[in-house]
Amino acid sequence: MYKHPWLPNLDLIDEMLKEIGVNSLDELFNDIPAEIKINRLLNVAKGKPLSEYEIEKEINEKVKKNVELQAPPFIGAGICPHYIPNVVKFIIGRSEFYTSYTPYQPEISQGLLQALFEYQSLMAELLDMDVVNASMYDWGSALAEAVLMANRINGKKTVLVPENANPFHKEVVRTWIGGKGIKIEEVKYDKNSGELDLEDLEKKSNIDDISAIYIQQPNFFGIFESNIEHVIDVAKHKRALSIVGVNPLSLGLIKPPGSYEADIVVGDGQELGLPLNFGGPLMGVFAVRWDMSLVRQMPGRIVGITKDTNGKMGFTLILQTREQFIKREKATSNITTNEALLAIANAVYLSLLGKEGMRELTEEIYFRSHYAAKKLTEIDNVSMPFRSDFFEEFAIRFPIEYDKISNKLKERKLQGGLKLSDYTSLFCVTEVHDKKSIDLLVSTIQEMINGVETS
């Protein structure tokens, strides 16, 4: 029999076919239309198995093609570069935590369960919320789950979402609610301030079918929403649930969502000790205020404290009848092990920072991002499209097409911001962007603009 270079067990095919009562591979796959079958060997890699040395050589050749940047990337859009203390990496790399095992058996999982409980407690304190679950996939999935949760609770079908919320999160929501009959209605934002347009909010909320109202703080443009408490009041008046999406890191500067009585809070823990890795893995945050009608409809897992038969305190998964332990169609979600390891990373990071460290870090980011915006707008004909206060991310409008600027930055081994329109880009500046890096970005852009305008 022909020996396939990748599959060592081809000589067992006849034996396996005989065992299942099938005469040939063609018969086994006869439900697949012939016109879409490939009846040839695929041209995979080098066409043969490689030795360990050859594999290592091949990988090293590819690694050499990577471009080493002169400065940390200036692109964010909700996923931003930060310094991660080595102790975070060390602790989550321990075998007790570095596992995909779900702690169904509390008698052998006390360490993992306690670590997740500590995450929940720290995040609850940071958000000023009562109940936090043990993690979600990311901000987008947490928001989608919040929308579905609101629909389960009140049965209404319309959710108001700001135009200035993260567009990637909105795409996730639209995907998740497909087939559910839930409608997303977008609320405009003020083109001068970048904040939510309250007049349009009043207009769009003037119906009885509002299930929830969502607002992001800071919004996608990095701008603080100064009227967020008014949005919460509108939701209460319409008997809808309020959903607040918040960057947890920004809470070193602004009021937490629990202080203005948000019903549901979502976010992402990426900026609390998680690296950049082609956009993942991320760590969704999900919290609610103390109301059992909310708690029992929460997605994901919740770790709680109980006592064993001897009266000794212990940790265990609680309210499990909400989750995948019951019939799938009755479960609030089926999110399984999700991002437990990254929740522990968040807990370690927050423990290391403490309250004062969090305040110092957010202030440092605030001042560095404002310094960068100031230096960029000192370039002739460069401006900020929005006049409101911002944190970490900010939009810049250029007199020439941003694609030209972006290409020049790449030539200089700099990663610019996210393109918002032909002439506008969203930049991100954090504690890892020192003055030298920011000044290099500014001088490169200034050189590019001056060169175009004088040519």
From Swiss-Prot:
Its EC number is 1.4.4.2. SUPFAM superfamilies: PLP-dependent transferases. Keywords: Oxidoreductase. Coiled coil: none annotated. Gene3D superfamilies: Aspartate Aminotransferase, domain 1 (3.90.1150.10), Type I PLP-dependent aspartate aminotransferase-like (Major domain) (3.40.640.10). Pfam families: GDC-P. The glycine cleavage system catalyzes the degradation of glycine. The P protein binds the alpha-amino group of glycine through its pyridoxal phosphate cofactor; CO(2) is released and the remaining methylamine moiety is then transferred to the lipoamide cofactor of the H protein. The glycine cleavage system is composed of four proteins: P, T, L and H. In this organism, the P 'protein' is a heterodimer of two subunits. Belongs to the GcvP family. N-terminal subunit subfamily. This is Probable glycine dehydrogenase (decarboxylating) subunit 1.
